[in-house]
């Protein structure tokens, strides 16, 4: 391969970091050495310069517009990933009773609950789908009690499940991790106290975490011993610039939001996502001979993360069955990669395969995957 040559693009089904819109990548490439006539890359800009100020302001404005964020909410660009929010939420919200309600629908909600417990919060797991391998989202119509907040993970990347409803909370602030579904659908922000999303699945490269928080939940007095960097007020007061923000990631995030707007906003993107997911689920549910099956139950299926097994994943624990299952899964992933379909290996807790079809994944990518799956099934039935 010669310098300057570009390899053929693959379809990247990674759970995150994930694919970005090609036109956004091309635009960023054009501006790499000279952004907005400044004669410098965003990578080189001072975060307090007049060159960067409009970049972060634009990103914030686009979040507010596309997500219809009410004026009494702050938009923050933080660091530390979604996992840091597992601590920031209880440190800033568990201030009265010291109690919180968690609905446990997968690994990430479970980790969030464990982090809160570590900080001395009385955590009540009020519902869980662990009994069925997190293959569904339990229905909790209303959350009530002496809780400082209630916590959910709106989309579960590992298990491929998603909330089809928003629990009523009787005035209790509802916190939601929307890392893997942010702007994949319309969401009524006013029903939540805090929303947060790591950017690396649907918004930008890894490095920034979007936090949307109702202003009355931003306290001057978090739990004793809370580090300055883990206080929401620290960042709200400084416009997300208490310390140096991830400037380039925020720049790309703004470009992705512009792309989403051109696609019709959250509603337009959601329609495309439904079409992609339905195409794949239809094949999984109706493939000849039942070679494949989806793992998530109908009514809880994610539009973003589609998890599936082959007929060789029987649940048998004998050595021969396990060896055959491993062989087929490995063969599928390897041959898919050779066909330009990468990062399809399922999480170790579920096994099988996982196709993450986030906003930037085109329908053609899903169609290419299904065609490969048909061929693989014929050759390995």
Name what the model sees in each region.
Residues 4-5, 9-10, 331, 338, ...:
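PLP-dependent enzyme catalytic core of the Aspartate aminotransferase-like
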Residues 9-60:
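A glycine-/small-polar-enriched, mobile loop at the entrance of the PLP active site in fold-type I
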Residues 21, 199-281, 297, 379-380:
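Active-site C-terminal subdomain of aminotransferase-like
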Residues 38-85, 92, 107, 115:
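Conserved N-terminal alpha-helix of the aminotransferase class I/II PLP-enzyme fold
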Residues 94-110:
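Conserved PLP-anchoring active-site segment centered on the Schiff-base-forming lysine
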Residues 116, 128-182:
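Active-site phosphate-binding strand-loop segment of PLP-dependent enzymes
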Residues 175, 189-200, 209:
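Conserved active-site segment immediately N-terminal to the catalytic lysine
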Residues 292-336:
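Conserved PLP-binding catalytic core of the aspartate aminotransferase-like
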């Amino acid at each position: 391969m010669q310098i300057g040559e570009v390899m053929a693009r693959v379809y990247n089904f990674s759970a995150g970091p994930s694919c970005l819109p090609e036109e956004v990548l091309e635009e960023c490439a054009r501006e790499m050495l000279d952004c907005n006539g400044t004669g410098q890359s965003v990578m080189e800009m001072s975060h307090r310069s007049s060159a960067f100020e409009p970049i972060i302001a634009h990103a914030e404005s686009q979040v507010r517009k596309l997500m219809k964020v009410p004026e009494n909410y702050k938009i923050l660009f933080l660091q530390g990933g979604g996992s840091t929010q597992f601590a920031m939420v209880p440190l800033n919200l568990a201030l009265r009773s010291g109690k919180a309600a968690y609905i446990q629908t997968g690994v990430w909600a479970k980790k969030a609950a464990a982090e809160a417990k570590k900080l001395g919060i009385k955590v009540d797991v009020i519902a869980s789908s662990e009994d069925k391998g997190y293959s569904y989202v339990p229905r909790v119509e209303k959350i009530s009690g002496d809780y400082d907040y209630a916590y959910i993970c709106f989309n579960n990347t590992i298990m491929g499940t998603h909330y089809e409803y928003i629990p009523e909370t009787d005035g209790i602030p509802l916190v939601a991790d929307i890392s893997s579904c942010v702007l994949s659908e319309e969401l009524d922000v006013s029903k939540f106290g805090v929303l947060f999303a790591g950017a690396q699945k649907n918004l930008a490269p890894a490095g920034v975490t979007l936090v949307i928080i109702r202003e009355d939940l931003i306290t001057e007095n978090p739990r004793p011993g809370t580090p300055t960097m883990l206080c929401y007020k620290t960042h709200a007061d400084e416009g997300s610039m208490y310390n140096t923000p991830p400037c380039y990631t925020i720049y790309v995030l703004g470009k992705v939001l512009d792309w989403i707007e051109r696609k019709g906003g959250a509603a337009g993107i959601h329609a495309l996502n439904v079409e992609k997911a339905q195409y794949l689920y239809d094949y999984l549910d109706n493939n000849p001979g039942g070679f494949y099956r989806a793992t998530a139950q109908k009514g809880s299926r994610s539009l973003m993360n589609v998890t599936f097994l082959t007929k060789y994943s029987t649940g048998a624990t004998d050595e021969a069955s396990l060896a055959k299952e491993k062989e087929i899964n490995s063969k599928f992933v390897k041959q898919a990669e050779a066909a330009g379909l990468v990062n399809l290996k399922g999480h170790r807790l579920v096994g099988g395969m996982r196709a993450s079809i986030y906003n930037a994944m085109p329908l053609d990518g899903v169609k290419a995957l299904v065609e490969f799956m048909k061929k693989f099934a014929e050759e390995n039935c």
